[in-house]
């Protein structure tokens, strides 16, 4: 080794020693004392001390150690020549033996690492030892460690002894240069004074002198280096400090200038956690206090820089100077190039005459364009209301006489030619936090500079070429005389509603001086969060009136002093009205204010009510007197007047009288439905002008403003912020009445329950009928002095609800529900009714409109009986026949099943299209809508409704149609579309503002809507439709009170015409029987107390009563079978014999029905028996014409009904009536399935809706019907007509104009003509079926809401929908790029569902040709054979049956209908014989999931069990195929798959087979077991299909897995397999009692467990490697929209429609060239060895470890070894593991 190398090693070791010394110095306090002694020694010897050198602490430690070594050098033996025992003895320590074979010593490469590792061993034996003294021992130990490792074959570079670097020393000629010696040897070598050679140059004295001289020179050199190093370090510190201070100063300056600084990071720089952080003032880093210094308790004050900035200085942002942009070569306005002015601050260029206004002189010096000098608005824009065009004229062109040259200024300032005025846009904007009065027009330039994003979003919603036109801009009724502010011209015609500019009230003020205030103004029809602050001198209409009203209220409530400027306003206003001074009015008012006795009855309405201009009806005044009487007695009240009698007005004026007469100051709480809040506000403003009413509704921000400004005059009485808390003080409350909704009662209970309420009014009090509701419980906890409940139906269902109302009113009196109901269990008795009235008398007041409104237009209710159509009769009889088992008394049908049958029959009475089968078979137009004539003729109610509505339309009447079925409303919409009527609709799904908008549109003057469709339940609450005078109850509700609520929407105060109510009842049906029962038994006992059919559980009517309802009219219905049955199109035959009793509604009968002038029977002399008989007394039967025109029909009907009630019912009635029909229908149904007697099809050749290929159908008909008279000539003629119709239809479709992309119709946004409901229906259909097919007319994909869309419009919307899915739009954006609203569309979820349904359908189609269309064809054949035998047994004259075998056709189910085996017509030729059990048909099905799921493991285990005739009873892959096929047919439901529909379909009956044994167990929840299993199984199949698709795509692009990704997995598997094979016999020996084998077995099992855990972890990471296939957009380097356009246009020959855009079906089914499937499968050694014989028995997995390993490997290899569909009928597949097999139950 050279000297240079020695020197390098010496230097490294010396630095290493220094670092060790520094480490040792920090470990103990004793070292500090030793360092001080060493410093004193150095000072005494003249060595520079640490303080003189100004060394940092590490250098101080180094110097101190050097002195210590020098001082103690004589005591230590040489560490390079001594052992560790000697060094330990010399130091005074106990030696430690260290095992160098430990794993932690194998990576040691230097002394420092070795010392840190050995130090704990030494300190453990020698506690408290100074670490500095251990260093020699470390050196010796390290030398021994190196020798030990070298002896064991591992070479470690040995530590070299340190050497000095020679320093040149000037010597005299006599002196001889001493050979170089190492410093350590020179220090440790002792001078021997007994050297015999004496003097000379080699003497010891001379050697010591040279050593001292050399050390002195070395110390001086080190001193110079140290000083230079200290100076450099100090300079760096000073530089960093200056940089930090400069950074702080710069930051403060930027902050003062308002420059937005970069935000600090949100997590700690050290621990990357959030919390309370210290922010650095010179960078963006943040730290926890504890992360900087664990001993720091408080953060430092003032400016603070983080450790990074202290060490490295502040971050310097290097800003690269961008090159100056060149100006445009053309004018930004006109795009011309000559004579342009260049902006000095931006790249824009302009002509001087293109600027608005034009320049008059050429600017000198630097010039900035209009875009640069336009000022930024001080406010933020809230929204853009409208825009308009603004014309800008150009200056006169430059004119030069001949021979004259234009000056340079003129050339620049004037255009060279005459230029037409140009147009620029102006935007009408609403400023945030400012009122609509401050809306302004802004130029397009300003908007483009400062609000680019807002403008861009605005253009997505409106047309950028045609300004929007609002309703107010087209009205001409406004005159400037009545509009001094020119509001219409300035605001209304540009989208501002007039109410938005009208002051509702002032809610607060701020005073700057005695006569200067700002007011917080709340605007009409805007929520409180839009309230704005306005100055008192702002010019706003009626602003002074609002200010005066505000101060009057404060004066009345607080006796607050009115400011002088407001007093001047008041005096000026009174002087203009001719009134005297205000003081005189106050004095007179005090004199008149006398407290009136509350027991005094009002004979006339009081003056303060008359001052409002309103007049109360006498009955309303009586109601107020009654409420005042109840108040005086402390009796809580129920005001139960019939709807429309003004309960709102009576309750408000009652509270108003209490306040005006001084009985109470309030406050009052009114809880009402949200839909009626607006009506309450209007009535309070009209009847109670001095009431300060606060409407406490809205979102969280609005309610926060209300609590802060409207609850109390005391500042801080309510804590600000969104969190609701109790009010701090109840003094000086600001309001008299708080009007709120049921929801706010629950949400803001904290503050509302903390107020002491003088009275409570609950509107629609039947919300309190359930004492378990949240509303009931919360409201009971309020502190309320008096309660008033308002309800139009106090007894809606039963006495329990009435008890809950009384319990809320008087909980101390009504607290035992059981005793109450028991006492009134027999309400039908007169004395009990009287007792109930006496009990309710003090609490309830109820008047009827018939009793009190003698001057109000009357209402007349008629029962209109209609006939069943032929199609309805067919379905009616079919429902009864199909439910024969439930109807037959012998079979014990339940009450619930009978109620379900009644519901089905009611649907049939409404319209047969409510049934799915009739809906699918109904004639439809090309666009999918129902054919109009068939729609009307197939329902008897529609036939009459058509005639009635046409005459009502001609007479100028308007109609409300009520139905309790929303599906019926859908069909009624189709009816209105067919008839061309405009309509509105309200059902349970339409709430809030949409409901109110529909009502306002219908009630608007001149509204074109003729019909209003309402659901009975949703249409009976908070709706005023007095503009309609005709009510049609299409189907009666179970609860008649709901019908009363419904038609009261029209018959109420405000109605000017007589109201006609027509109740449709189908003759001879359950509807008629139910109506007749209600007509005779409408006392409280039948439908109120006992709840009847209105009860939810349906148990209040006995089975006998239900059976009586079902029997009504059935006998007559089935007697009509001798007449020919009409077809589905509703057209009868000419040979039909008319029924003499059939009701015929001709024109004369309809005119008589609609006659409003005829006198109502019994109108004068009839006296109402009791208020509970309102429903009964309102029933009137309409007069209609019959064939016999018998006037005594009604009497006969009544007599018959009464007699029928006393007759004993025949227990065999249903069996006699239906058994024969039931058997016939069973036979007919089975024949239609494909076996039995051939059914000749009845073909109507005159129909225009025949098949597409007429000639083919004609040929088929000729084959079936011999001797047909229709020849080919007729076929050709019809073919020609068909071609003509087809060409005409195509011409119309081509000429059809698409609706606009976005349009607003009736307040709703339409997209390509699709309203919100239709868009929702399209989305739901996509989520259920995937994307629609190409042939829309033949598809069942379309839903009802989309049938009226043409094919062109439908495809256009489908294309738009897909284009939106392909847009890379942010999920939280409100609209797509074209402005279409997103409406919460989840792009990822929709695409996933479309892809999944596509994969699923493709998989089913792949194997459908092998497996057929029926899952269990043999079961179907058995059913056909049974039907054939039943048909033979019913033949007349049957004597004997030949017993001969029947040939069973075992061909697949896709055979032609003509090849099906036929049943002979004669009984003697019928063959019946017990056939042997047919073999189960083979099948094929496979999913190649690559072993990534447990699907194949389950299949192997299941198919071992599914043998020997158990192919249907054990679930396996056959069932999985049929489950997928069923999902492909039925699709997804709203949230999940509806497995009930699948299990009810006979085609998929195999799905039910595995559950039959479970269903027999009564302790098992049968439905729950099935649904859970099917959901779990389908989820597994879904995952497998997705993985197969990923594998297919990976193989299609030759994607291979990297060996590194599966290498670790293969290694772990090899170790697992090796361990298992090596210990195969251990388990057997352990069972024989070998203890050693038992210990080895436990150790082996533990090792296997670890290996399996690692293997599971590796397998879990494998599917992620498949997802690494690059997306299509990345592989094609195209955006999603470009790919979509390529697929649509198909200009590329490779992208032709005939070629699929995706890879082929599956790599394991149709292999492609150069495909390598093995590279995308897991490479396990056992993957390719899975062949077992068919006779192999299931392996006993618990008995052998190796068996488990082998089966686990085989389970993941099934899909990898097959390239074709798997035919499991020919061979068996090996079993899977026990774990996989036991994860599913074996059904």
UniProtKB/Swiss-Prot annotation:
Residues 628-812 form the Helicase ATP-binding domain. Residues 192-243, 1761-1773 have a biased composition (Basic and acidic residues). Keywords: ATP-binding, Chromatin regulator, DNA-binding, Hydrolase, Metal-binding, Nucleotide-binding, Nucleus, Repeat, Zinc, Zinc-finger. Expressed in the head and vulva. GO terms for cellular component: chromatin; histone deacetylase complex; nucleus; NuRD complex. Residues 1-80, 170-258, 1120-1141, 1186-1212, 1248-1295, 1754-1787 are annotated as: Disordered. A motif (DEAH box) lies at residues 763-766. One of its GO terms (biological process) is negative regulation of Ras protein signal transduction. SUPFAM superfamilies: Chromo domain-like, FYVE/PHD zinc finger, P-loop containing nucleoside triphosphate hydrolases. Residues 373-476, 501-583 form the Chromo domain. It comes from the Eukaryota. Residues 56-71 have a biased composition (Basic residues). ATP binds at residues 641-648. ATP-dependent chromatin-remodeling factor that has a role in notch signaling-dependent vulval cell fate determination. May also have a role in pharyngeal precursor cell specification. Belongs to the SNF2/RAD54 helicase family. This is Chromodomain-helicase-DNA-binding protein 3 homolog. It comes from Caenorhabditis elegans. The gene is chd-3.
């Amino acid at each position: 080794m050279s000297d240079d190398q020695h020197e390098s090693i010496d230097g490294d070791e010396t630095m290493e020693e220094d670092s060790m010394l520094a480490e040792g110095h920090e470990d103990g306090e004793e070292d500090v004392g030793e360092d001080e002694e060493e410093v004193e020694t150095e000072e005494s010897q003249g060595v520079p001390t640490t303080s003189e050198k100004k060394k940092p602490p590490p250098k101080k430690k180094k110097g101190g150690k050097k002195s210590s070594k020098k001082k103690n050098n004589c005591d230590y033996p040489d560490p390079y020549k001594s052992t560790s025992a000697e060094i330990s003895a010399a130091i005074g320590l106990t030696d430690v033996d260290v095992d160098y074979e430990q794993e932690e010593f194998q990576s040691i490469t230097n002394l420092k690492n070795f010392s840190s590792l050995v130090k704990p061993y030494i300190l453990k034996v020698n506690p408290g030892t100074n670490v500095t003294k251990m260093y020699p021992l470390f050196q010796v130990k390290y030398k021994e460690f190196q020798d030990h490792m070298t002896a064991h074959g591992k070479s470690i570079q040995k530590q070299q002894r340190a050497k000095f670097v020679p320093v040149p020393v000037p010597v005299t000629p006599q002196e001889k240069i001493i050979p170089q010696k190492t410093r350590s040897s020179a220090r440790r070598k002792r001078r021997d004074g007994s050297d015999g050679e004496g003097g000379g140059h080699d003497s010891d004295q001379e050697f010591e002198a040279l050593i001292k001289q050399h050390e002195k020179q070395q110390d001086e050199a080190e001193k110079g280096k140290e000083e230079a190093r200290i100076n450099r370090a100090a300079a760096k510190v000073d530089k960093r400090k200056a940089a930090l201070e400069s950074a702080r100063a710069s930051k403060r300056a930027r902050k003062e200038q308002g420059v937005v600084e970069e935000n600090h990071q949100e997590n700690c720089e050290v621990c990357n956690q959030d919390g309370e952080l210290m922010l650095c003032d010179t960078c963006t880093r943040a730290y926890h206090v504890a992360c900087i210094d664990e001993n720091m308790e408080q953060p430092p004050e003032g400016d603070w820089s983080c450790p990074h900035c202290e060490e490295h200085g502040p971050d310097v942002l290097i800003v690269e100077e961008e090159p100056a942009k060149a100006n445009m070569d053309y004018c930004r306005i006109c795009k011309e190039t000559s004579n342009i002015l260049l902006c000095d601050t931006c790249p824009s260029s302009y002509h001087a005459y293109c600027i608005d206004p034009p320049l008059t002189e050429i600017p000198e010096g630097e010039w900035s364009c209009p875009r640069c000098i336009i000022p930024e608005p001080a406010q933020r824009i809230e929204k853009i209301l409208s825009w308009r065009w603004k014309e800008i004229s150009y200056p006169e062109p430059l004119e030069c006489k001949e021979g004259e040259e234009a000056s340079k200024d003129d050339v620049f300032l004037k255009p060279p030619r005459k230029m037409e005025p140009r147009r620029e846009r102006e935007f009408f904007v609403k400023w945030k936090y400012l009122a609509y009065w401050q809306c302004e027009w802004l130029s397009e330039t300003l908007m483009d500079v400062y609000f680019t994003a807002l403008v861009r979003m605005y253009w997505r919603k409106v047309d950028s070429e045609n300004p929007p036109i609002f309703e107010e801009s087209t009205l001409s009724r406004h005159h400037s005389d009545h509009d001094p502010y020119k509001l219409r011209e300035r605001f209304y015609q540009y989208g501002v509603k007039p109410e938005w500019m009208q002051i509702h009230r002032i809610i607060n003020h701020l005073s700057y001086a005695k006569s200067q205030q700002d007011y917080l103004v709340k605007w009409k029809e805007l929520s409180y969060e839009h309230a704005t602050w306005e100055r008192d001198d702002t010019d706003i209409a009626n602003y002074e009136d609002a200010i005066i009203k505000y101060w009057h209220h404060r004066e009345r409530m607080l006796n607050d002093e009115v400011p002088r400027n407001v007093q001047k306003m008041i005096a000026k206003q009174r002087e203009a009205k001719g009134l005297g001074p205000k003081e005189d009015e106050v004095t007179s008012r005090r004199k008149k204010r006398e407290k009136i006795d509350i027991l005094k009855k009002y004979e006339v309405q009081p003056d303060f009510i008359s001052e409002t201009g309103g007049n109360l009806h006498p009955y309303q005044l009586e109601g107020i007197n009654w409420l005042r009487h109840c108040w005086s007695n402390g009796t809580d009240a129920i005001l139960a007047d019939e709807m429309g009698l003004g309960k709102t007005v009576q309750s408000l004026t009652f509270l108003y009288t209490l306040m005006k007469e001084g009985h109470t100051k309030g406050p009052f709480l009114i809880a009402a439905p949200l839909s009626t809040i607006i009506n309450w506000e209007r009535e309070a403003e009209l009847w109670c002008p001095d009431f300060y009413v606060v409407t406490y509704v809205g979102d969280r921000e609005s309610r926060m403003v209300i609590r802060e400004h409207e609850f109390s005059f005391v500042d801080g009485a309510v804590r600000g912020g969104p969190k609701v808390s109790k009010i701090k003080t109840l003094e000086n409350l600001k309001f008299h009445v708080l009007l709120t909704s049921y929801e706010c009662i629950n949400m803001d209970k904290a503050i509302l329950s903390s107020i002491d309420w003088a009275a409570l009014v609950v509107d629609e009090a039947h919300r309190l009928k359930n004492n378990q509701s949240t509303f009931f419980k919360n409201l009971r906890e309020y502190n309320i002095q008096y309660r008033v409940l308002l309800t139009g139906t106090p007894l809606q269902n039963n006495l329990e609800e009435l008890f809950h109302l009384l319990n809320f009113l008087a909980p101390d009196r009504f607290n035992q529900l059981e005793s109450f109901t028991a006492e009134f269990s027999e309400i039908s008795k007169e004395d009990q009714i009287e007792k109930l009235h006496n009990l309710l008398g003090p609490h309830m007041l109820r008047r009827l409109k018939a009793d009190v409104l003698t001057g109000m237009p009357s209402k007349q209710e008629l029962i209109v009986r209609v006939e069943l159509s032929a199609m309805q009769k067919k379905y009616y009889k079919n429902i009864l026949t199909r439910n024969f088992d439930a109807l037959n008394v012998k079979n014990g049908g339940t009450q619930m099943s009978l109620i379900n049958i009644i519901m089905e029959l009611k649907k049939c009475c409404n319209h047969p299209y409510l049934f799915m089968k009739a809906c699918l078979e109904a004639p439809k137009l090309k666009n999918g809508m129902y054919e109009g004539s068939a729609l009307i003729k197939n329902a008897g109610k529609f036939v009459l409704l058509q005639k009635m509505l046409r005459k009502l339309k001609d007479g100028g009447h308007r109609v409300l149609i009520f139905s309790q079925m929303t599906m019926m409303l859908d069909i009624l919409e189709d009816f209105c579309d067919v008839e061309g009527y405009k309509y509105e609709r309200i059902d349970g799904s339409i709430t809030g503002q949409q409901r109110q908008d529909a009502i306002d549109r219908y009630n608007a003057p001149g509204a074109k809507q003729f019909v209003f469709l309402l659901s009975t339940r949703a249409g009976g609450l908070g709706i005023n439709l007095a503009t309609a005078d005709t009510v049609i109850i299409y189907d009666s509700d179970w609860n008649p009170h709901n019908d009363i609520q419904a038609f009261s929407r029209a018959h109420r105060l405000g109605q000017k015409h007589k109201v006609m109510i027509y109740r449709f009842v189908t003759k001879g049906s359950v509807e008629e029987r139910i109506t007749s029962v209600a007509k005779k038994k409408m006392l409280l006992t039948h439908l109120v107390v006992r709840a009847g059919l209105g009860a939810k559980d349906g148990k209040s009517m006995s089975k006998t009563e239900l059976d009586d309802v079902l029997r009504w009219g059935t006998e007559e219905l089935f007697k009509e079978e001798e007449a020919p049955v009409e077809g589905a199109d509703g057209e009868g035959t000419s040979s039909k014999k008319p029924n003499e009793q059939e009701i015929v509604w001709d024109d004369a009968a309809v005119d008589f029905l609609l006659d409003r002038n005829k006198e109502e029977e019994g109108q004068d002399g009839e006296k109402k028996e009791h208020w509970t008989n309102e429903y009964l007394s309102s029933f009137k039967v309409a007069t209609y014409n019959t064939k016999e025109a018998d006037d005594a029909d009604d009497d006969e009907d009544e007599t018959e009904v009464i007699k029928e009630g006393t007759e004993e019912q025949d227990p065999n009635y249903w069996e006699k009536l239906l058994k024969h029909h039931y058997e016939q229908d069973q036979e007919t149904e089975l024949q239609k399935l494909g076996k039995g007697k051939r059914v000749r099809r009845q073909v109507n050749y005159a129909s225009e809706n025949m098949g597409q290929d007429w000639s083919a159908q004609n040929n088929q008909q000729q084959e079936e019907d011999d001797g047909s008279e229709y020849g080919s000539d007729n076929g050709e003629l019809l073919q020609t007509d068909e071609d003509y119709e087809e060409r005409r239809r195509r011409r119309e479709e081509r000429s059809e104009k698409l609706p606009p992309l976005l349009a607003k119709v009736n307040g709703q946004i339409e997209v390509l003509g699709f309203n919100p409901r239709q868009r929702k229906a399209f989305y739901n259909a996509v989520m259920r079926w995937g994307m629609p097919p190409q042939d829309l007319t033949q598809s069942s994909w379309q839903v009802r809401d989309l049938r009226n869309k043409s094919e062109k419009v439908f495809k256009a919307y489908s294309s738009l929908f897909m284009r939106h899915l392909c847009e890379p739009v942010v999920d939280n954006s409100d609209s797509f790029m074209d402005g279409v609203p997103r409406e919460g569309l989840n792009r990822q979820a929709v695409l996933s569902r479309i892809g999944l349904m596509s994969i699923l359908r493709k998989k089913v189609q792949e194997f459908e040709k092998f497996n057929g269309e029926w899952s269990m064809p043999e079961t179907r054949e058995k059913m056909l054979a049974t039907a054939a035998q039943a048909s033979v047994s019913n033949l007349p004259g049957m004597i004997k049956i030949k017993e001969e075998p029947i040939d069973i056709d075992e061909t697949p189910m896709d055979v032609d209908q003509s090849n099906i085996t036929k049943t002979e017509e004669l009984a003697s030729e019928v063959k019946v014989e017990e056939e042997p059990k047919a073999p189960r048909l083979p099948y094929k099905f496979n999913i190649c999931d690559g072993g990534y799921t447990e699907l194949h493991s389950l299949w192997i285990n299941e198919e071992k069990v599914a043998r020997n005739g158990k192919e249907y009873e054990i679930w396996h892959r056959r069932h999985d195929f049929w489950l997928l096929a069923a999902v492909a047919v039925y699709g997804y439901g709203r949230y999940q798959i509806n497995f009930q529909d699948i299990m009810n379909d006979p085609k998929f009956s195999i799905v039910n087979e595995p559950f039959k044994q479970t269903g027999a167990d009564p302790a098992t929840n049968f439905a729950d077991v099935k649904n859970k299993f099917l959901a779990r199984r389908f989820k597994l199949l879904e995952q497998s299909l997705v993985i197969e698709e990923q594998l297919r795509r990976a193989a299609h692009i030759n994607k291979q897995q990297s060996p590194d990704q599966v290498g670790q997995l293969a290694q772990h598997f090899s170790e697992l397999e090796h361990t298992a094979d090596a210990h195969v016999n251990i388990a057997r020996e352990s069972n024989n009692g070998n203890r050693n084998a038992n210990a080895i077995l436990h150790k082996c099992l533990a090792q296997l467990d670890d290996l399996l855990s690692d293997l599971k972890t590796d397998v879990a990471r494998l599917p992620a490697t498949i997802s690494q296939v690059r997306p299509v957009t990345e592989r094609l380097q195209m955006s999603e929209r470009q790919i979509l356009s390529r697929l649509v246009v198909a200009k590329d020959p490779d992208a032709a429609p005939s070629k699929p855009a995706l890879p082929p079906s599956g790599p394991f089914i149709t292999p492609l060239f150069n495909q390598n499937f093995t590279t995308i499968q897991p490479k396990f050694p056992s993957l390719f060895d899975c062949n077992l014989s068919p006779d192999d028995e299931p392996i006993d997995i618990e008995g052998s470890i190796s068996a488990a390993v082998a089966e686990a490997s085989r389970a993941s290899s099934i899909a990898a070894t097959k390239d074709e569909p798997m035919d499991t009928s020919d061979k068996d597949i090996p079993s899977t593991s026990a774990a996989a097999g036991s994860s599913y139950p074996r059904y």
